[in-house]
Amino acid sequence: MKPDNQAGVKHKGAAKTARIPIKIVPLDEKLKKPEWIRAKLPNGQRFHEIKQILREQKLHTVCEEATCPNIGECFSKGTATFMIMGDICTRRCPFCDVGHGRPNPLDENEPRHLAESVAAMRLKYVVVTSVDRDDLRDGGAQHFADCINAVREMSPATQIETLVPDFRGRLDIAVDILTQTPPDVMNHNLETVPRLYKQARPGADYAHSLQLLKDYKAKNPNVRTKSGLMVGLGETDEEILEVMRDLRAHNVDMLTIGQYLQPSDGHLPVLRYVHPDVFKMFEEKAYEMGFVHAAVGAMVRSSYHADVQAHEAGV
């Protein structure tokens, strides 16, 4: 049996969140899911085709690793969000179901495997995300660039969206590297309001994440920038609106807001289910603030219908 701190050992659920600075306090009684929280069950031939291609190419998707509720619908439509640089994250965010631990070294063949999969799946739009890699000097920025180059070479008509980590401590070098091979959309999720960062995003910094989005836009004015938020962690509506204002002040073009759903009892509990009328209010406010596109609703995730979001934003 491998020691807990050995490279490649993945911790999930309570094993992952046991050492976060603010401990998870479970509710005496879980909130009942309202009737508007519904996802389609995984099914169909296309769903299984996608899974087979991913396994053959030894690729990971955030759809599977983060236990996304929309996996059935997306896979059945032939869309997937690829997760590069392994399936082990160096952070312990207690809202996220991706495993934590010491990651394995980067796979130098991954960009080629990714490009081959995109071609095999005949994808017109692809989202590429990653785990956090605080162990790498550039946070993995060059690996992102290599993946973009490989996909562009094999599928030149395919549009690419990157959903990047925060590259904390490596912002300037990461922005420089990612400017050399720009995607069509650059996404970095703020996830929650600044008051809840220490609890929900240990290791991250709200101002740093905003700066990453602003600096990238400054160097790549023709690339749409995008960010996403969850609701249900204990934030107020006004705090969400304030984050939206901050995003616009940092020149972010596109917005997603969705309902947080607890992946397991070892994760942060859901403290409220936001009513569809409130989501509608957020959407209306987003357009009033000047967002080019806003995807807002209970089942919205940052990569859900990402192609539709991008095309409606003029990409």
Swiss-Prot record:
Enzyme Commission code: 2.8.1.8
Name used for this protein in its record: Lipoyl synthase
Swiss-Prot/TrEMBL cofactor(s): [4Fe-4S] cluster
PROSITE patterns: RADICAL_SAM
Domain named Radical SAM core: residues: 75-292
GO cellular component: cytoplasm
Keyword S-adenosyl-L-methionine carried by entry: yes
Residues involved in [4Fe-4S] cluster 2 binding: 89, 93, 96
